[in-house]
């Protein structure tokens, strides 16, 4: 997490609206509770803190940090924060962040592709390297083990909150 603010600066060069204070994301002590609620991170606007669930699979923590830094820099919509997070990861020059951003992009684009064409999705998925496949499998297992009624309620409430925010 300590490298995240500096890594984020790679995206700022081309997009001055992303410029801002270099605040380090905070590892949450209550990460297991965040996992139970299906949260990988959240931005707390009253303190300006980007809070990260450090119990979530390691492969997505750098991209999650970039997502929350996007919120710190004024990007409110979740899909836009996701886009900026991937951009920042890919422009960071840091192999760990680049991998995390690419894997996150694959996850979201793969889900969209699967809805449009399961056959095309399977063709693309077959090209993944073993490490990426293992990380995605570990991510799926992690979240499946936390698929509870509390998680469903939390997700429903948060989704409702996001809709009220536009």
Predicted features by range, described:
Residues 59-63, 80, 97-104:
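Alpha-helical scaffolds flanking conserved acidic
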Residues 86-118:
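Short helix/loop segments within enzyme catalytic domains
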Residues 128-166:
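Pan-zinc metallopeptidase signature
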Residues 63-82, 86-87:
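Active-site recognition of the HExxH zinc-binding catalytic motif
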Residues 51-55, 66-74, 95-96:
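Second-shell loop/turn segments in exported
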Residues 1-54, 58:
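Auxiliary, metal-adjacent structural segments of Zn-dependent hydrolase domains
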Residues 111-127, 131-136:
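C-terminal amphipathic alpha-helical segment
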